[in-house]
């Protein structure tokens, strides 16, 4: 295995054509982003549409010190825009209307479709008009519990079109967890599908939503309208399974509406709601160490800049590339790097519904070959699971289109890194091992494909505008080599602004331990070459397959059993799922 000193240089062909083609160029741009953030991000902001111009005197203000007053971050304050306009109308005006926005690849290889930017805009406007017809307006919260289908992207962007705040919940969460999140954000509308196949497993999404809405009603909150996509009848069921599930979808009169009954006849024109840069865009729940989920709140202008810029540089995206992120849209990776970041760059992406193992264990590599994918972004858990199979499952496919391989969710172990680099990338691809969180909105520590010499397992260096610091237990900064708490001393545009309806908890969780710093809850160490290595959580959180769960959350479930009076949960390493 490589030692900590082992360095892999970017392939000459990757570096030669990269947006950032040397480490010296990275360092120069990074320094500019720290010394002159207004100038650095202001130049990037010019690529986007602002209905109200940007006031450069109020471009960027913040306070990270609880001793000096309330914690806040503001970027481009006073400027107005609409993200769906920037992702769709702007790209169409720039000549990309007929470009493929998404290749949709279903759970079964016989199911696939595609959607252009022009068609995506039409469908977004249709559904936005339907939402408006049901009284959904600017600032209202909309809960989304959807599989990886095109309507999920349409629903997200329809919310942003009219200024509604979307709250996605991964369609694997229980009705209990979902209802807790619906009640917390007081969602007026819910969007789901009748059901979905994941591999050979059937998930009755609408039934789970019904249970969740019942629980909400018992707790005094009624969801006013539930839109249901009829998905099952248009897809191929796993062989040997009869797909008559759609007949069983229960619909409640006056509340539940089939998508196909209202969307096709709606108008394809919907004027965008111009939002303040600091208006809420979406909220996404993440586990809290006390057990109650935290509604992480992201806002409009800064998030747009950061999603767009990290996507462009970290994946070195070029106009004719095909990009594929395997993450579910229910997680932050799906928000930033399946929906917002790619579309902000007029990218063509693959949207994949299934698992890595269906119908065979080489499905990922078959999809890469089918669409000639250039950038592939997945989790170490998936890589470790796929490593267990024979190499021929990878080598039988033509993966020569690949240029950048990404990793997300947890630090990648060196064994998995080497397998990914050698077997999947043929020692020609750059690996970007990205560290970030739901709270950060986008990558904060990452190599850049053409610029950063790679160390297997290292998160490497900060992205533009990000200033990492290592602190010891007493809050003293660790210079040079050393290990400590990973904190950040200033905000970047894509950072969370608050926890929904709970700013006190926001300040306590992230800013009280070390006044003046955003505390990630992770530890890290800096090696002799200045590379940062994330060492894992330093709070009461478990990292399971790249997803955070609190020990308190698991303990509370265990103690619900009448045979359990006390429960304590500790992490245990797992060869595939991590620790």
Report residues per predicted region.
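Conserved ATP/PPi-binding loop(s) of AMP-dependent carboxylate-activating enzymes
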Residues: 461-465, 476-510, 547-549
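Gly/Ser/Thr-rich phosphate-binding loop
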Residues: 260, 347, 374-378, 387-454, ...
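Conserved AMP-binding/adenylate-forming core of the ANL superfamily
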Residues: 84-85, 98, 102-157, 174-179, ...
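AMP-binding/adenylate-forming catalytic core of the ANL superfamily
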Residues: 169-195, 209, 369, 376, ...
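Structural core segment of the AMP-binding/adenylate-forming
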Residues: 157, 161-261, 379-380
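Conserved AMP-binding A3 loop
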Residues: 113-118, 273-274, 281-305
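Conserved AMP-binding/adenylation subdomain of ANL enzymes
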Residues: 302-322, 332-375, 388-392
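Conserved pre-ATP/AMP-binding loop-to-beta segment of ANL
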Residues: 98-100, 224-231, 242-243, 250-285, ...
């Amino acid at each position: 295995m490589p030692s900590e000193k082992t360095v892999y240089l970017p392939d000459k062909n990757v570096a030669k054509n990269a947006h950032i083609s040397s480490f010296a160029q990275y360092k120069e741009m990074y320094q500019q982003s720290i010394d002159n953030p207004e100038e650095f991000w202001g130049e990037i902001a010019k690529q986007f549409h602002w209905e109200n111009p940007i006031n450069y005197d109020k471009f960027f203000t913040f306070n990270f010190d609880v001793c000096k007053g309330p914690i806040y971050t503001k970027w481009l304050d006073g400027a107005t825009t609409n993200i769906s306009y920037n992702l769709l109308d702007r790209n169409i005006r720039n000549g990309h209307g007929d470009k493929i926005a998404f290749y949709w690849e279903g759970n079964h290889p016989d199911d696939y479709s595609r959607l252009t930017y022009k068609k995506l805009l039409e469908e977004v406007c249709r559904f936005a008009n339907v939402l408006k017809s049901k009284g959904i307006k600017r600032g209202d919260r909309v809960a989304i519990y959807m599989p990886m289908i095109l309507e999920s992207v349409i629903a997200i962007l329809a919310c942003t079109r009219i200024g509604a705040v979307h709250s996605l919940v991964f369609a694997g969460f229980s009705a209990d967890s979902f209802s807790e999140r619906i009640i917390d954000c007081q969602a007026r509308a819910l969007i789901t599908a009748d059901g979905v196949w994941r591999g050979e497993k059937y998930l009755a999404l609408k039934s789970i939503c019904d249970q969740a809405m019942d629980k909400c009603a018992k707790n005094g909150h009624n969801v006013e309208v539930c839109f249901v996509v009829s998905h099952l009848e248009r897809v191929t069921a796993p062989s040997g399974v009869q797909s008559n599930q759609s007949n069983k979808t229960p619909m409640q009169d006056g509340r539940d509406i089939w998508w196909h009954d209202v969307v096709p006849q709606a108008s394809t024109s919907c004027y965008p709601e111009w939002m303040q840069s600091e208006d809420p865009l979406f909220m996404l729940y993440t586990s809290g160490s006390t057990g109650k989920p935290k509604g992480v709140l992201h806002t409009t202008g800064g998030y747009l800049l950061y999603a767009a810029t990290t996507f462009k540089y970290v994946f070195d995206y070029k106009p004719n590339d095909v990009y594929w992120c395997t993450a579910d849209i229910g997680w932050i990776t799906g928000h930033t790097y399946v929906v917002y970041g790619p579309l902000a760059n007029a990218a063509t992406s693959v949207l994949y519904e299934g698992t890595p193992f269906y119908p065979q264990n080489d499905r990922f590599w078959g999809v890469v070959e089918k669409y000639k994918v250039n950038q592939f972004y997945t989790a170490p858990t998936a890589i470790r699971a796929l490593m267990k199979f024979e190499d021929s499952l990878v080598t039988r496919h033509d993966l020569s289109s690949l240029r950048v391989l990404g990793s997300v969710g947890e630090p990648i172990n060196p064994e998995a890194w080497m397998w990914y680099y050698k077997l999947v990338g043929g020692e020609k691809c750059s690996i970007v091992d990205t560290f970030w969180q739901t709270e950060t909105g986008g990558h904060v520590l990452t190599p850049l494909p053409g610029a950063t010499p790679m160390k297997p397992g290292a998160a490497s260096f900060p992205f533009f505008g990000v200033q990492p610091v290592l602190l010891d237990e007493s809050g003293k900064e660790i210079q040079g080599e050393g290990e400590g708490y990973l904190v950040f001393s200033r905000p970047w545009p894509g950072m969370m602004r608050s926890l929904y309806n709970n700013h006190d908890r926001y300040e306590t969780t992230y800013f009280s331990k070390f006044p003046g710093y955003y505390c990630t809850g992770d530890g890290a160490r800096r090696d002799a070459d200045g590379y940062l290595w994330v060492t894992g959580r330093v709070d009461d959180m478990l990292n399971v397959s790249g997803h955070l769960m609190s020990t308190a959350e698991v303990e509370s479930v265990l103690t619900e059993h009448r045979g359990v009076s006390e429960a304590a949960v500790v992490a245990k390493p797992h060869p595939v799922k991590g620790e």
